[in-house]
Swiss-Prot record:
This is Thiamine-phosphate synthase. InterPro entries: Aldolase_TIM, ThiamineP_synth_sf, ThiamineP_synth_TenI, TMP_synthase. Its EC number is 2.5.1.3. It comes from Clostridium botulinum (strain Loch Maree / Type A3). 4-amino-2-methyl-5-(diphosphooxymethyl)pyrimidine binds at residues 37-41, 69, 108, 137. 2-[(2R,5Z)-2-carboxy-4-methylthiazol-5(2H)-ylidene]ethyl phosphate binds at residues 134-136, 165, 185-186. Gene3D superfamilies: Aldolase class I. The gene is thiE. The lineage of its organism: Bacteria, Bacillati, Bacillota, Clostridia, Eubacteriales.
Amino acid sequence: MEINYGLYLITDRRFLKGRQLKKVVEDAILGGVTIVQVREKDVSTREFYNVAKEVKEVTDYYKVPIIINDRLDIAQAIDANGVHLGQKDMHLNIAREILGKDKIIGISVGNVKEALEAQNNGADYLGIGTIFPTGSKKDVDAIIGIDGLSKIKDSISIPSVAIGGINKTNFKDVLKTGIEGISVISAILDEDDIKLAANNLLINK
């Protein structure tokens, strides 16, 4: 599957406001989302599995890749396209042994050293951040800004997406770095019109 990282949605059910996750993901895809990561913190394995399976029904229908945050077992159980790992999650080399060469593995990085290490270890793409202050992620060590993003982007050759505080007012500045995509949570999920919110983050509307 050819991967378009252009508009990368990360799920967070705290923003649902009573809406169905499947419907929200579908509207986001119809608005222009090109890849979906299912992220669930502090839930049981069974609940995570059920949520991921539900989202995969939508992504399969629209032929959009689905990535699972952190949990290799969930990724395997639903036959996801891949996983996204943080610096403290399963080591990339071990994840590759478990998932095989055909699955996508993305790594979160916050500096050039981490980016080069992930690239050299065989990451398929990088999530670079945190770019701007954000309310979605509380354990942010450092805001790297556009300058930090540019330095990391210039040091690597694999695809990457920017994450952290990206919204409709600043996303064009982020894309000027040549990054392959932007990764968002609240910029889409916290809006009343999901489809329009996604569409507002497309550079070529």
